[in-house]
């Protein structure tokens, strides 16, 4: 069986700001897709499948947004796969898209990883509910800090490095 190679043909990003009130979730994603397609010299007709990577749904306050955004992503009538790995979702989306090409199943796959966290309360979304943990409401930084410190305690070469 011949090995199929996978490559990134183009990229597209949107403006990084605290809030984009000028566009919807679909509009934000479409901006990035249009830029990626232009960068690659491709059109939606060239795309065989779409892989969408997005963190947990409660960050935007909408369940399964990839379904109502299918038209904006050029995925109508094409295979649409959702990747959900939270903090590593961007990298995981690329891996899934590359795997689909390398398998020989599809020739061109559009990989889209996105978040528009200004749509909901990200601090609430990152806080694990009681009774599973203490109600600190500290978000990702506050949640992971004790884990990082514990890792440093066991892996740092000297006591000075552990503080």
Regions found by a protein language model. Give the residues of each.
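Short glycine-rich phosphate-binding loop at a beta-alpha junction
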Residues: 48-53
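Condensing-enzyme catalytic core mediating Claisen C-C bond formation in acyl metabolism
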Residues: 1-26, 127-130, 153
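Conserved catalytic cysteine-centered active-site region
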Residues: 2-4, 54-112, 116-143
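Short, well-ordered amphipathic alpha-helical segments that serve as non-catalytic structural scaffolds
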Residues: 26-40, 65, 93, 144-151
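Conserved small/polar residues in nucleotide/adenosyl-binding loops
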Residues: 154-161
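Phosphate/pyrophosphate-binding loops at sites that engage ATP/ADP/AMP, CoA/4′-phosphopantetheine
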Residues: 34-47, 156
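Residues at alpha-helix termini
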Residues: 38-39, 72, 103, 153
């Amino acid at each position: 069986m011949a090995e199929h190679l996978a490559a990134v043909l183009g990229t597209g990003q949107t403006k990084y700001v605290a809030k984009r009130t000028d566009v919807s979730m679909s509009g934000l994603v479409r901006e990035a897709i249009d830029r990626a397609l232009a960068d690659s010299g491709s059109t939606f007709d060239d795309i065989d499948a779409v892989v969408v990577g997005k963190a947990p749904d409660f960050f935007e306050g909408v369940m399964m947004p990839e379904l109502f955004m299918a038209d904006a992503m050029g995925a109508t009538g094409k295979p649409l796969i959702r990747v959900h790995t939270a903090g590593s979702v961007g990298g995981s989306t690329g891996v899934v898209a590359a795997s689909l090409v390398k398998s020989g199943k599809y020739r061109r796959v559009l990989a889209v990883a996105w978040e528009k966290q200004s749509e909901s309360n990200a601090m609430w979304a990152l806080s694990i509910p009681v009774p599973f943990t203490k109600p600190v409401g500290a978000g990702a930084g506050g949640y992971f800090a004790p884990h990082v410190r514990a890792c440093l305690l066991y892996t740092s070469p000297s006591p000075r490095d552990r503080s």
